[in-house]
Amino acid sequence: YVTEQWDPVPAYHDILMKLVADSLRGCPELNTALIEGNIVQHDLVNIGVTTDTERGLLVPVVHDVRSKSLQVIAEESAKLVEQTQAGTLPLDKLREGTFTITNLGMYDIDAFTPIINLPECAILGVGRIVPKVVVVDERTLTTGIRRIMALSLTFDHRLVDGGPAAKFLQTLKSLIEKTQ
């Protein structure tokens, strides 16, 4: 999926952005917003990535993620993070997010409950990746060590029910497991 020649090499959040955008195809309800009492269905998937700065938390947005290659996402994301950290991010790069990803894995957090970035419908919380013993064959109960990452989805029940949200997570899980 990723080659070493890429510059920059995509970070986990870049890969997750692409996989989230693909997963939202099957659950467009999560790509909505409640604006002035109206449910707005977004055509584009614009994903914000939470970024901790000396000035507080900011959420720069990669626009139209579905139409971009992983390499382009990685390039844009790296530039956004750099500008955010430097305090030079243009305000328009903080606008029009339709879904947010937040990652606390670098702080050794396994799982957490993220708070929705309103007016968006949902936010995906990403925990650290850790090796764990898991059953790899349910028929024989064979175990093995696999790298596991917890995902926490917080969503607005006014906009989407639990079933579609669970379907989104199921699709995302499947895509992550297939990605090498």
Mark where each language-model region is.
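C-terminal catalytic/motor cores of large multi-domain enzyme assemblies
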Residues: 1-180
